[in-house]
Amino acid sequence: MLRFKYCILAAIAALMITSCEKNVQIITEINRDGTCTRFYSIKESDNVYADETWVEDTADTVRTTIYRTFNSVGEMAANPVLAVNGEFINSQAQLDKKFKWFYTDYKFSETFASKEHFINVPFADKMSRDELSFMLTGYPNLTEGMTGAEIADFIGPLQEKYEYLATLSMIDCDLRLIANHYDMIANPPVDRTTFMSLSDSITRYALDESWDILRHRNGLIQDYFKSDAYSIFYDSNDDIKDEFEDEYEGYLNFVDLYYLITPYNLKMPGRIIETGRGTLKDGVINYCFGGKYLLLGDYTITASSRVTNVWAFILSGLIVLLALASLLYRRG
């Protein structure tokens, strides 16, 4: 499990924008009467916690698909099932329906609550909020209007800062846990305070040496200090290592959230007018959404559509015809 998560975080450091790998797909269908149905299509994910009120679609043998119909989008949002390490990803949804005689307009929005507290290292002194958001989600588009050469010059330094933060995120988990158990170490090369002050230096060392943290997690700190004093947390088979690994899992919420890829499909009644950040294909609005979009704040999905009230046109036509007939009758 740890090796798998390290692999994911290492990939994060090398990527600007991750493609929408569908481990959990969300499908929301809005009906004309304001009711809605939520679907979750799941493949090899432990991020969905659904109770017996959800129905499983047994026809899908490749993925697990569950669904539930709600009286309103508010009720839908009040029943979350997506979670990271047991903490639900909450949302608030709203549907505005406006009758305009010939048309009925629908405006839908769903705002997913921020998980900014999952970020385990400070980033403000390395990257601005917009820069980190750009690296995580592509928004805001900081390269708008740039030429290809200008984009390359802009991305290079930004990528270096991003890789530093990604590496620090990996190392920081170990440093904090070791510091919490520093009294277990026999003859440490430095005291606890000094040890914690070296996080930047250790991170730079890992980057300069191109250290393979994935395969040699236990060797980095020992190689940096040229000491085996910290090996009790990695190499022993006793309770110290087990306790260390159990606590370590709790520090990886950032990785779990980042890797939660949840493409969001939205079906609205009538003709789609506005898709927000989504793209329209075959009448379905597709949003590339996932946990990383929540690392720096709330994330809102918006869309609007229009239903043509055919009966209103027919009725209006009949009224016009009756009015004309009445006028002609009076003149006759």
Regions inferred by a protein language model and the residue ranges of each:
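Bacterial N-terminal signal peptides that target proteins for export
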Residues: 1-8
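C-terminal motif of bacterial Sec signal peptides marking the signal peptidase cleavage site
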Residues: 16-19
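Start-of-domain marker
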Residues: 21-75
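Mature, soluble, non-transmembrane domains
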Residues: 57-319, 326-327
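C-terminal membrane-anchoring or membrane-association module
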Residues: 324-332
